[in-house]
């Protein structure tokens, strides 16, 4: 089945794997998804990721992170900018929940968090929010 919104598919696979208490999930590869995974590892929302290219189609294997009580580290992950309605923010981007969560942006300088974008004084497309 073809996917029209690959970022929404990425988010949904992570959310569903966390809700099902799976240790890993596989996601079709793209450079954007690899950069998103790298950012989520840096911010502590997922344990690690591995790009696997031995198959016919490359994919990313994400190792999910859980709290000591067994709950997913990602409490909420929601798509903001959608194919039918793109959402862009300027350099005066507001904090998500007063800084408790993050907005993930696609900018001219790559994939950044809202904090990094504010520090660099740039805006971009708000891909999703995560708590």
Curated annotation (Swiss-Prot):
Keywords carried by this UniProt record: Ribonucleoprotein, Ribosomal protein, RNA-binding, rRNA-binding
A biological-process GO annotation: translation
Xref: Gene3D superfamilies: 3.30.1370.30, 3.30.1490.10
Assigned GO CC terms: ribonucleoprotein complex; ribosome
Domain of life, per lineage: Bacteria
Gene Ontology MF term list: rRNA binding; structural constituent of ribosome
Pfam family, one: Ribosomal_S8
Sequence similarity: Belongs to the universal ribosomal protein uS8 family.
Known role: One of the primary rRNA binding proteins, it binds directly to 16S rRNA central domain where it helps coordinate assembly of the platform of the 30S subunit.
Quaternary state and interactors: Part of the 30S ribosomal subunit. Contacts proteins S5 and S12.
Protein name, as recorded: Small ribosomal subunit protein uS8
Gene responsible for this protein: rpsH
């Amino acid at each position: 089945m073809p996917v029209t919104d690959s970022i929404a598919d990425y988010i949904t696979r992570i959310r569903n794997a966390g809700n099902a208490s799976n240790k890993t999930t596989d996601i079709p590869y793209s450079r954007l998804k690899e950069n998103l995974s790298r950012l989520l590892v840096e911010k502590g929302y997922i344990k690690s990721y591995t790009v696997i290219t031995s198959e016919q189609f490359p994919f990313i294997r994400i190792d999910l992170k859980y709290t000591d009580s067994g709950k997913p580290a990602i409490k909420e992950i929601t798509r903001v900018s959608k194919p039918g309605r793109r959402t862009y923010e300027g350099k005066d981007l507001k904090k998500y929940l007063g800084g408790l969560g993050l907005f993930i942006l696609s900018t001219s300088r790559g994939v950044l968090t809202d904090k990094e974008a504010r520090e660099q004084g740039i805006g971009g497309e708000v891909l999703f929010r995560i708590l």
